């Protein structure tokens, strides 16, 4: 099991009385829109890595939705190193240029790439095309040209879900509403930063309480264990100061990055409080049944005397409330004691232990369910030349199929 700083109780999933559905509150259309990058990023711009948002037009969205991968012609003249000898000038001239329908978007993307240093990583409103990196020459999310971006976006199932099913399993905000809201789609271009995946963390917030935290990368990292209390303190303070009272919804999931020297917390993403969000080292049933950490609970009874534990750096501080005319009963005291005994002091911070079976998955391919045959993968891992050669052959095959189809149609007339 993944490592946590407290003993993990027997999973509720082992019960014979399992619920047929996870006990999520209804996920509304507005909650999904609030978790869209274009909605929350302007509010937290100073907390996020440098990025630019490009509003997308209907023709460009139609291009992303269309079957097949047809890329605009490159402006640069191919060289011998490009291994594009499978293309002839005539064949290149015959290929349609899809960007003629959205020239302004195409130009804006080229300009933005240059402004952000020449290398960016793309995403749409909610998802990044991480499942399509096998199509990229570099096998990652780095993009240097608009065509690099288009290839990733059009090859990604995650992007298709953003476009086709953004409100899957959602309910209207108003019970009598029968329509779904329009989505203002945006292309997000983020300046490329070589993130250390071991320092990315997913944080779960329920009713404006930071409930639990875990690694995003599911490998074991020895150095994280001595840092756990420092990282938890940083994340708690970041949440309390920046997100707790400013995000529109009380429950959500956010991702952060805390690079050395572990002083600054970067907000990477905000995700819905919904089953579609990966709970990673937890299960959703476990999260939904967790009790709030008592160290960050707020006391509403100002007139009653209480003792509260609060998180302050790496220490536990006792806060005593004044009592004026307190007449709480023994039953109430016993109930409060029971809550304190059963509840954790701080948000659980779960890390992967050395002896976890999944602790050494460095070579395990991610998103394998979204990938294509071995020949395509082999081409993608052989460098820029291999993928370019494969794309050239692919275009040849498509052209021959189209020619044969035209011939068959003529013969049948």
Curated annotation (Swiss-Prot):
Its main location: cytoplasm. One of its GO terms (cellular component) is cytoplasm. Transmembrane segments: none annotated. It is found in: Cytoplasm. GO terms for biological process: eukaryotic translation initiation factor 2 complex assembly. Keywords: ATP-binding, Chaperone, Cytoplasm, Magnesium, Metal-binding, Nucleotide-binding. Residues 1-23, 71-101, 322-343 are annotated as: Disordered. InterPro entries: CDC123. It comes from the Eukaryota. ATP binds at residues 123, 126, 128, 130, 190-191, 200, 202, 216, 255, 269, 271. The keyword Transferase does not apply. Mg(2+) binds at residues 269, 271. Residues 79-101, 327-343 have a biased composition (Acidic residues). GO terms for molecular function: ATP binding; magnesium ion binding; protein folding chaperone. ATP-dependent protein-folding chaperone for the eIF2 complex. Binds to the gamma subunit of the eIF2 complex which allows the subunit to assemble with the alpha and beta subunits. Belongs to the CDC123 family. This is Translation initiation factor eIF2 assembly protein. The lineage of its organism: Eukaryota, Fungi, Dikarya, Ascomycota, Pezizomycotina. The gene is cdc123.
């Amino acid at each position: 099991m993944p490592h946590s700083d407290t003993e993990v109780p027997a999973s509720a999933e082992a019960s014979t009385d399992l619920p047929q559905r996870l006990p999520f509150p209804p996920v509304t259309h507005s909650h999904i829109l609030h978790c869209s990058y274009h909605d929350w990023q302007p509010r937290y711009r100073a907390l996020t890595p440098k990025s630019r948002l490009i509003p997308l037009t209907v023709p460009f969205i139609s291009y992303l939705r269309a079957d097949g991968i047809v890329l605009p012609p490159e402006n640069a003249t191919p060289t011998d190193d490009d291994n594009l000898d499978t293309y002839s000038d005539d064949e290149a001239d015959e290929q349609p240029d899809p960007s003629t329908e959205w020239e302004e978007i195409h130009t804006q993307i080229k300009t933005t790439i240059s402004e952000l240093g020449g290398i960016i990583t793309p995403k749409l409103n909610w998802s990044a095309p991480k499942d399509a990196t096998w199509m990229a020459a570099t096998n990652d999310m780095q993009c240097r040209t608009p065509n690099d971006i288009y290839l990733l976006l059009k090859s990604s199932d995650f992007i298709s879900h953003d476009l086709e099913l953004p409100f899957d399993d959602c309910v209207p905000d108003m019970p009598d509403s029968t329509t779904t809201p329009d989505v203002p789609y945006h292309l997000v271009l983020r300046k490329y930063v070589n993130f250390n995946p071991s320092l990315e963390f997913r944080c779960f917030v329920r009713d404006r309480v930071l409930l639990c935290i875990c690694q995003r990368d599911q490998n074991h990292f020895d150095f994280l264990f001595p840092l756990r209390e420092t990282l938890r303190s940083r994340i708690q303070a970041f949440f309390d100061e920046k997100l707790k009272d400013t995000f529109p919804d009380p429950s959500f999931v956010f991702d952060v990055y805390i690079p050395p020297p572990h002083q600054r917390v970067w907000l990477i993403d905000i995700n819905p409080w919904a089953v579609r969000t990966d709970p990673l080292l937890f299960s959703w049933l476990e999260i939904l049944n967790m009790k709030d950490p008592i160290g960050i609970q707020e006391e509403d009874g100002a007139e009653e005397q209480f003792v509260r534990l609060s998180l302050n750096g790496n220490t536990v501080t006792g806060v005593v409330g004044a009592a004026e005319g307190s007449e709480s009963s023994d039953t109430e005291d016993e109930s409060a004691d029971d809550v304190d005994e059963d509840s954790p002091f701080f948000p659980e911070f779960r890390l992967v232990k050395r002896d976890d079976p999944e602790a050494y998955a460095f070579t395990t391919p991610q998103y394998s369910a979204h990938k294509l045959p071995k020949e395509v993968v082999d081409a993608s891992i052989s460098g820029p030349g291999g993928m370019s050669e494969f794309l050239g052959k692919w275009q040849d095959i498509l052209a021959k199929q189209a020619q044969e189809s035209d011939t068959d149609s003529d013969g049948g007339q």
